[in-house]
């Protein structure tokens, strides 16, 4: 169960590691949202400001163009070009937004009769704007024609650079007419859009400042929101990791929230409680199973866990085998009722089993009243300790049995114990729906035969030469050679046997 929990814990931590945190997602989403809002606000603001300033500039230009056209009507009709030149020259000096002013004479095929700067005078087509702009201005049927274009070369006025090539300009053209409506000429004024562009740029900068402030405020709000949402999730993650690690008594402490996270924490706690109940049941089942198949046996035939046990799984080991049998059990059982035999055996086996457990061995199987126990190869001394403890426990069992029944005349129970060391095969037999564990090998048969010799030689505990040779502290036991050459059934070679004094 520990390996299973570690695998679950590892998978859970990998899962959480692959996911970006909620705090990061909220911060990133908020940032993108704020940036999108800032972009939209700046775009709308810039367009609005640009439209507003352009409209103001356009209205002012139209009014000025109409006023000047009306003013210049008399001068044009009287061909007072010098006065017109003075007026438009003064206009450019007073207002730097005006880049050029052109007055053409319809009687002279739209030749420019007055201009400022004066370099365009007497030209038909000025080279400061494209030909299409000039044609549109001259041929327009509108009283006031407005177009935005780019100047084609640098413009100087009063020996100073007034505009650079490529600068955007708004050209307003109006007809110069008599009161009767006869067309006398055309007034064209080029107005710089620098201030309009500067105003739009300032508006965009202001919007960016406001947006940046909003972004900072949004980040702060998003941080606290992310903190509010992610901290419970992080604590819940830690709780889940602890539960996955096997701490089924752990509970997520997020009861103060009444939202989905609180509901999730409640579900996790309910899951943990259910898992704890299930694992407790499983542990009881495994503990009960170990009473049928010892854990040491399972570790040999199913090292990867009992869930992976298969029919035919086997392992060869050198072990010390102990057999114990009640002498005269058949005649004794004939004088007892079946239920009395059942109770007697349980009491007796419990007494013997406790001694074996204390000595570090484990019981492989019960064969009627006989007990077969196993000890690891390095614990041969423990097998002898177990035999001695079993004899001592049996004496106590006999005394208690006599006291409980109140019949002091009951015969005392005696047992024979045989111990041998050798190679055995531990494994499973059966088929898929019914599996049993077993230990087989010549060493098992020899141990059983040695136990049978205890009655013949009148000894309680007999061991073989292989056991004596593998003792770590033989001086700790009282050993006596009984027979150095005895043949047991099923063995061709004679073996030596020793008595162990309890």
Swiss-Prot record:
The keyword Signal does not apply. It is a multi-pass membrane protein. Binds 1 Mg(2+) ion per subunit. Residues 320-451 form the Guanylate cyclase domain. GO terms for biological process: cAMP biosynthetic process; intracellular signal transduction. Residues 227-280 form the HAMP domain. Its EC number is 4.6.1.1. Keywords: ATP-binding, cAMP biosynthesis, Lyase, Magnesium, Membrane, Metal-binding, Nucleotide-binding, Thylakoid, Transmembrane, Transmembrane helix. The chain crosses the membrane at residues 26-46, 204-226. Mg(2+) binds at residues 325, 369. One of its GO terms (molecular function) is ATP binding. Residues 47-203 are lumenal, thylakoid. It is found in: Cellular thylakoid membrane. It is an enzyme of class 4 (lyase). Residues 1-25, 227-502 are cytoplasmic. Pfam families: Guanylate_cyc, HAMP. InterPro entries: A/G_cyclase (IPR001054), Adenylyl/Guanylyl_Cyclase_3/4 (IPR050697), HAMP_dom (IPR003660), Nucleotide_cyclase (IPR029787). Its main location: membrane. GO terms for cellular component: plasma membrane-derived thylakoid membrane. It catalyses: ATP = 3',5'-cyclic AMP + diphosphate. It comes from the Bacteria. The N-terminal half could sense signals such as pH or a change in membrane potential and regulates the catalytic activity of the C-terminal half. May function as a membrane-localized receptor protein. Belongs to the adenylyl cyclase class-3 family. PANTHER family: ADENYLATE CYCLASE, TERMINAL-DIFFERENTIATION SPECIFIC, ADENYLATE CYCLASE, TERMINAL-DIFFERENTIATION SPECIFIC-RELATED. This is Adenylate cyclase.
């Amino acid at each position: 169960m520990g390996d299973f929990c570690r695998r679950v814990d590892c998978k859970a931590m990998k899962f959480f590691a692959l996911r970006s945190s909620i705090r990061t997602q909220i911060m990133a989403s908020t940032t993108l949202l704020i940036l999108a809002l800032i972009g939209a606000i700046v775009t709308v603001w810039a367009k609005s400001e640009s439209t507003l300033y352009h409209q103001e500039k356009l209205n002012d230009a139209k009014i000025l163009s109409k006023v000047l056209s009306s003013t210049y009507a008399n001068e044009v009709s009287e061909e007072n070009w010098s006065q017109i030149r003075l007026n438009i020259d003064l206009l450019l000096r007073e207002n730097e937004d005006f880049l050029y002013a052109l007055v053409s004479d319809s009687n002279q095929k739209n030749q420019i009769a007055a201009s400022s700067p004066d370099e365009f005078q007497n030209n038909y087509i000025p080279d400061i704007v494209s030909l299409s702009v000039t044609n549109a201005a001259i041929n327009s049927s509108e009283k006031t024609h407005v177009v935005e274009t780019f100047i084609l070369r640098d413009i100087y006025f009063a020996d100073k650079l007034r505009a650079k090539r490529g600068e955007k300009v708004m050209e307003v053209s109006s007809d110069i007419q008599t009161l009767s409506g006869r067309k006398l000429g055309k007034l064209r004024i080029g107005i710089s859009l620098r201030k309009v562009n500067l105003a739009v740029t300032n508006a965009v900068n202001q919007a960016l400042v406001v947006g940046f402030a909003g972004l900072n405020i949004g980040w702060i709000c998003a941080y606290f929101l992310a903190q509010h949402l992610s901290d419970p999730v992080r604590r819940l993650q830690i709780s889940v990791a602890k539960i996955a690690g096997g701490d089924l008594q752990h509970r997520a402490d997020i009861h103060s929230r009444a939202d989905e996270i609180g509901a999730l924490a409640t579900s996790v706690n309910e899951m943990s409680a259910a898992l704890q109940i299930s694992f407790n049941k499983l542990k009881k089942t495994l503990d009960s199973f170990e009473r049928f198949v010892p854990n040491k046996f399972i570790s040999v035939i199913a090292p990867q866990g009992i869930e992976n046990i298969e029919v035919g799984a086997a392992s060869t080991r050198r072990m010390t085998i102990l057999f114990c049998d009640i002498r005269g059990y058949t005649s004794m059982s004939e004088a007892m009722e079946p239920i009395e035999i059942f109770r007697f055996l349980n009491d007796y086996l419990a007494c013997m089993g406790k001694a074996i457990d204390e000595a570090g061995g484990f019981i492989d199987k019960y064969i009627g009243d006989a007990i077969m126990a196993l000890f690891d190869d390095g614990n041969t001394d423990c097998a002898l300790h177990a035999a001695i403890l079993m004899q001592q426990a049996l004496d106590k069992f006999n005394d208690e049995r006599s006291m409980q029944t109140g019949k002091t005349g009951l015969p005392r129970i005696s047992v024979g114990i045989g111990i041998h060391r050798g190679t055995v095969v531990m494994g499973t037999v059966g088929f898929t729906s019914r599996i049993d564990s077993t230990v087989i090998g010549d060493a098992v048969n020899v141990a059983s035969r040695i136990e049978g010799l205890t009655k013949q030689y009148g000894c309680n505990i007999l061991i073989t030469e292989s056991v004596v040779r593998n003792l770590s502290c033989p001086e700790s036991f009282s050993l006596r050679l009984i027979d150095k050459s005895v043949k047991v059934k099923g063995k061709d070679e004679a073996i030596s046997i020793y008595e162990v004094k309890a």
